[in-house]
Curated annotation (Swiss-Prot):
Family: Belongs to the ATPase alpha/beta chains family.
Documented EC number(s): 7.1.2.2
Family matches, as Gene3D superfamilies: 2.40.10.170, Bovine Mitochondrial F1-atpase, Atp Synthase Beta Chain, Chain D, domain 3, P-loop containing nucleotide triphosphate hydrolases
Protein name in UniProt: ATP synthase subunit beta
Length: 467
């Protein structure tokens, strides 16, 4: 069947109106191609009288009224499967790494339904990250969804890079990284880091373990809105082959923001704080597809920017509902020089349950949180009256809490070049042993600076000898 042909009748920034014959009107999400150009338009609204409103997935420079447009009659499709490994692609699956075309033998549409309820597979298995604070208070589930929440400059991307370093490199499965509206420099650094560590095999790309999809912050809103779906489609294809996939998204907030821009351009009435009225639905459509089935699993780690450090902002608040573990990064903790700046009282995990992690882990985590909470309550009294006015048991709780706080810090492998101290991977058993000793009072004689930026508790004892 010949492709339906239309003409551009209006072009306002990234929004392009196209007129077709009334009986050939494209469906919502159909991909339209420009004559003599690589630009793709995606249908968002049917305005009636054969006119559709579309979003340009690329720059709309040079478009003018009267240009010819063809309807492909299908959703945007992107290459999936082994051909994507070791490659950097854009929202349409076109390569941007200057290593030749991507094999298009296997393709899949970026819009599809989430798996049915009876296909889903819940998981109780823990995923060890080697980061003490995460493994202790907000453990990750294999096949679960994790959010890294934080304002500007508290370390979301560095934490994500460390998780990739600790999990993806040791992980026998495959990883997909979707860079949604983030800095191009970070995408470039990530690629070179993956190449240096062998996760991207430059000699034989098919042996690589990661596929990368980028729609960075200099791209039009259409690209940033759809690039998460492109990455997810590639991850789903690996999952449906029966593999265990790690899916990293940096940053899910930019996905929301791109939706806000597109919504405003389409003329929709904004809702709370200027967000799109379809925020919950758009987020749900993406998040419900990121799931594990009986065939394979997707473990997803998403960075979530928190505007003005306000966790009640509609965007992070909508994301919270979909996650199994939430890692909240705090500016107050970062200002103390404690990195990773994870707030152990705000961060949560569904896995922190004695039936899942075991009684020992659960009791240690709760004792650590209880000690830190007591310190938080006493801080006002200390600020007004000083430490000397506290009861002896409260003084002891404060001393232990300060040691715990410092022991929650850890040198990262990915930050080695900045800090000069080698990164540490701490096993879950060592993490529990260390915090158990501090809570039990076995380290009361050590100075608190011995606990700062060390790996295991044995290193703290060694450091104490030098202090």
């Amino acid at each position: 069947m010949a492709q339906a042909q239309g003409k551009i009748v209006q072009c306002i920034g990234a929004v392009v109106d196209v007129e077709f014959a009334r009986d050939q009107m494209p469906k919502i999400y159909d991909a339209l191609k420009m004559e003599g150009s690589a630009l793709t338009l995606e249908v968002q609204q049917q305005l009636g009288d054969g006119i559709v409103r579309t979003i340009a997935l690329g720059t709309s420079d040079g478009l003018r009224r009267g240009n010819t447009v063809y309807n492909t009659g299908a959703n945007i499709t992107v290459p999936v499967g082994k051909a994507t490994l070791g490659r950097i692609m854009d929202v349409l699956g076109a390569p941007i790494d200057e290593r030749g075309p991507v094999d298009q033998t296997l393709t899949a549409p970026i819009h599809r339904k989430a798996p049915a309820y009876d296909e889903l597979s819940p998981s109780q298995e823990l995923l060890e990250t080697g980061i003490k604070v995460i493994d202790l208070v907000c453990p990750f589930a294999k096949g679960g969804k994790v959010g890294l929440f934080g304002g500007a400059g508290v370390g979301k991307t560095v934490n994500m890079m460390e998780l990739i370093n600790n999990i993806a490199k040791a992980h026998s499965g495959l990883s997909v990284f979707a860079g949604v509206g983030e800095r191009t420099r970070e995408g470039n650094d990530f690629y070179h880091e993956m190449a240096d560590s062998g996760v991207v095999n430059l000699e034989n790309l098919g042996e690589s373990k990661v596929a990368m999809v980028y729609g960075q912050m200099n791209e039009p809103p259409g690209n940033r809105l759809r690039v998460a779906l492109t990455g997810l489609t590639i991850a789903e294809s690996f999952r449906d082959e029966g593999r265990d996939v790690l899916f990293f998204v940096d940053n899910i907030y930019r996905y929301t923001l791109a939706g806000t821009e597109v919504s405003a351009l389409l003329g929709r009435m904004p809702s709370a704080v200027g967000y799109q009225p379809t925020l919950a639905e758009e987020m749900g459509r993406l998040q419900e597809r990121i799931t594990s089935t009986k065939v394979g699993s997707i473990t997803s780690i998403q960075a979530v920017y928190v505007p003005a450090d306000d966790l009640t902002d509609p965007s992070p608040a909508t994301t919270f509902a979909h996650l199994d573990s939430t890692v909240v990064l705090s500016r107050d903790i970062a200002s103390l020089g404690i990195y990773p700046a994870v707030d152990p009282l705000d961060s949560t995990s569904r896995q922190l349950d004695p039936n899942v992690v075991g009684e020992d882990h659960y009791a240690t985590a709760r004792a650590v949180q209880g000690t830190l909470q007591r310190y938080k309550e006493l801080r006002d009294i200390i600020a007004i009256l000083g430490m000397d006015e506290l009861a002896p048991e409260d003084k002891l709780a404060v001393a232990r809490a300060r040691k715990i706080q410092r022991f929650l810090s850890q040198p990262f492998h990915v930050a080695e070049v900045f800090t000069g101290s080698p990164g540490k991977y701490v096993s879950l058993a060592e993490t529990i042993r260390g915090f158990k000793m501090i809570v039990a009072g076995e380290c009361d004689h050590l100075p608190e600076q011995a606990f700062y930026m060390v790996g295991t508790i044995d290193e703290a004892f060694e450091k104490a000898k030098k202090v």
